[in-house]
């Protein structure tokens, strides 16, 4: 094998192994066996992930049953990984593999070197120079061994570290250590610098933003905490590339901006994800399918700013690790989280499998099926569905696919350094807002703010800024471009408030926005009541005679959501996050966006080639007139006068391709 790279085929990233284009639909398991590997191989899977780990998982059972390879300082035993690789080679003789290498401090290392355990307290150890060097040496030794012995069968490597292998610094909750204190002084170039005390870091949950008297101190530390982890990933990536020379793909789990709830987004250390997403040394990013969007009546969702990854030619793997109806609820007698609420039967399982596939196919994302502790996919129906999805992906690859989104969503990690991590602000503006976005009936692209100067304004009609609390110069220039283009901007909560206060909000929205005095937990829109358990302070309303009200506070009857049309563009402001699909659809429709579904219970997954529909009940879809084929079933559907009726069936997913005339 000479070189593995990512190649766009008809607009979509694929794995290219010496010119052989392979669909990035893959398999992973903590308990690989001859049966589950060969089942997926026979279904057409060609890419397989192999985990090398002697670590104990969150469930207090081993990640891998094959044993440890990092035995002591500079002492390695590669026999356990060899045995596992040989199983994969035997069970998937035509497969290619990605080795997942766990870099954490082992129990022997913690005892010998007296450092914190990286699996639980990553940020307290990750700056330790000796551990970094020894972990990098282990990483390089494992790669060299694998390449020398099996190089023609490996397409890539994943670097794992931190809680649940996802580079989370979970349990330390930003707490200091001697190692971290030393690194912080060096970061600030200040020998007297101190990590802020816990009572300064843990601020009142009623306040959305950091207190003025501690803001500079806390914001500097939060940035250091996040960059420490991101920069460490890039350190290990550079070390790995010193061996790989970019001839194989390299990946990590990282950047869960939309998923980490509450204070976890700050504590776990993913806010500096842009550095990793844009690094030339990283090729692949992975995350599980969003946990909050897995129910049979939900929509499926990504955890990351997908379109920034795609723009930077990074392959994004969505991990399907849903607990299927066949999955045992426990492993070695220990309940798997969610095991007591697993998918109830094969219909629900196949519905969600197909829905995740439609989400990935519409966006051009990769996907792997995770048979976590074995047996989660042991049914003919499930393997047949996987076989069909692989064949569909191959057929789709022969035709051009591109985004038809007319909505650009912009999110930012760095704009959250100024926010109070206990306020729930990220949940309102980011995590929970995915629900409304998924149900507004139109596709959207989601970018990180680092790409603001590269987004083609002409492609979109509506721009949604979810958390532009502290926009930089690049974002401000982008906003001015939009305002000159005649498009629509939707602002959420407190744009440009963090440094410039109300004056900043008023200038960037071109509206008179005022602080709200009094308690409010409900906003009435034209379509529904938006009810909130907690709205942090400050709260705002619009006091502007030229604004068209779209949402009114229940108690004060002040305008919470409103639109203002100018000669060149339309400004829409919402004082609350987590807008529902109906409200977003109304804003999008007014902006001229093409709407495919006017029913919030029927999400759609759309690109230039197909229209994916997920409907548990009868559905009506807006699409070009003509005959369409559902490629899951080969059933025909007809759209007349731009509308298609889809009766409810046994399965909820329809993947519709218009027949050639």
Task: Go through each PLM region and give its residues.
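Hydrophobic targeting/anchoring helices
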Residues: 246, 251-432, 517-538, 550-552, ...
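Aromatic-lined substrate-binding rim segments of carbohydrate-active enzymes
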Residues: 34-120, 143, 235-243, 470
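A short, well-structured beta->alpha microelement
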Residues: 29-32, 271-276, 436-456
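N-terminal carbohydrate-binding accessory modules
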Residues: 1-42, 396-398
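A conserved amphipathic helix/loop scaffold
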Residues: 349, 466-661
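The substrate-binding groove and active-site-proximal loops of carbohydrate-active enzymes
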Residues: 23-30, 56-79, 118-137, 214-231, ...
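Polysaccharide-binding and catalytic clefts of secreted carbohydrate-active enzymes
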Residues: 100-102, 110-291, 299-300, 305
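Hydrophobic faces of well-ordered beta-strands that scaffold small-molecule active sites
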Residues: 25-27, 48-50, 97-101, 155-159, ...
């Amino acid at each position: 094998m000479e070189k593995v790279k990512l190649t766009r085929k008809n607009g979509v990233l694929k794995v290219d192994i010496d010119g052989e284009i392979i669909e990035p639909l893959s398999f992973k398991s903590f308990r690989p066996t001859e049966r589950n590997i060969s089942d997926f191989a026979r279904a057409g899977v060609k890419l397989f992930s192999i985990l090398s780990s002697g670590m104990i998982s969150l469930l207090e059972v081993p990640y891998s049953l094959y044993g440890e390879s990092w035995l002591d300082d500079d002492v390695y035993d590669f026999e356990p990984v060899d045995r596992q690789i040989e199983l994969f080679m035997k069970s998937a003789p035509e497969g290619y593999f990605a080795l997942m290498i766990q870099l954490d401090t082992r129990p022997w290392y913690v005892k010998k070197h007296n450092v914190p355990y990286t699996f639980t307290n990553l940020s307290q150890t990750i700056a330790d120079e000796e551990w970094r060097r020894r972990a990098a040496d282990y990483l390089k030794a494992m790669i060299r061994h694998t390449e020398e012995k099996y190089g023609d069968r490996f397409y890539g490597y994943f670097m794992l570290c931190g809680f649940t292998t996802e580079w989370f610094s979970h349990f330390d909750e930003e707490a200091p250590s001697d190692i971290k204190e030393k690194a912080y002084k060096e970061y600030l170039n200040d020998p007297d610098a101190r990590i802020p005390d816990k009572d300064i870091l843990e601020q009142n949950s009623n306040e959305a933003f950091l207190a003025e008297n501690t803001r500079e101190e806390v914001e500097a530390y939060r940035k250091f905490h996040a960059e420490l982890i991101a920069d460490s990933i890039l350190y290990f990536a550079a070390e790995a590339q010193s061996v790989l020379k970019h001839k194989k793909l390299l990946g990590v789990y990282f950047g869960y901006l939309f998923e980490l709830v509450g204070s976890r987004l700050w504590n776990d250390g993913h806010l500096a994800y842009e550095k990793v997403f844009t690094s030339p040394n990283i090729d692949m990013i992975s995350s599980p399918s969003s946990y909050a969007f897995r129910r049979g009546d939900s929509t499926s969702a990504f955890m990351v700013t997908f379109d920034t990854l795609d723009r930077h030619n990074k392959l994004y793997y969505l991990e399907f690790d849903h607990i299927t109806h066949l999955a045992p609820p426990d492993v070695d007698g220990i309940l798997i989280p969610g095991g007591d609420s697993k998918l109830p039967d094969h219909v629900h399982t196949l519905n969600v499998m197909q829905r995740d596939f439609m989400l990935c196919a519409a966006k051009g994302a990769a996907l792997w099926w995770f048979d976590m502790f074995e047996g989660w996919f042991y049914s003919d129906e499930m393997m047949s569905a996987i076989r069909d999805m692989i064949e569909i992906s191959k057929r789709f690859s022969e035709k051009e696919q591109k985004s038809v989104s007319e909505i650009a969503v912009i999110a930012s990690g760095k704009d959250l350094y100024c926010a109070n991590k206990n306020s729930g602000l990220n949940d309102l503006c980011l995590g929970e807002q995915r629900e409304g976005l998924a149900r507004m009936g139109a596709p959207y692209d989601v970018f990180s703010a680092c790409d603001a100067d590269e987004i083609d304004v002409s492609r979109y009609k509506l721009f949604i800024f979810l958390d532009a609390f502290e926009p930089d110069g690049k974002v401000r220039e982008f906003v001015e471009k939009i305002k000159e283009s005649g498009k629509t901007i939707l602002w959420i909560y407190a744009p440009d408030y963090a440094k410039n206060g109300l004056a900043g909000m008023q200038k960037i929205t071109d509206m008179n926005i005022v602080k709200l005095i009094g308690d409010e937990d409900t906003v009435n829109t034209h379509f529904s009541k938006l009810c909130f358990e907690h709205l942090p302070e400050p709260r705002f309303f619009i006091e502007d005679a030229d604004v068209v009200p779209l949402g009114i506070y229940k108690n004060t009857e002040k305008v919470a959501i409103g639109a203002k049309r100018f000669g060149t563009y339309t400004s829409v402001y919402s004082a609350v996050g987590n807008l529902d699909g109906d409200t977003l659809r109304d804003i999008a429709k007014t902006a001229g966006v093409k709407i495919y579904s006017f029913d919030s219970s029927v999400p759609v997954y759309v690109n230039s080639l197909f229209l994916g529909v997920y409907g548990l009940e009868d559905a009506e879809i807006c699409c070009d007139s003509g005959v369409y084929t559902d490629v899951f079933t080969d059933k025909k559907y007809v759209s007349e006068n731009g509308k298609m009726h889809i009766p409810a069936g046994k399965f909820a997913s329809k993947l519709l391709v218009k027949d050639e005339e």
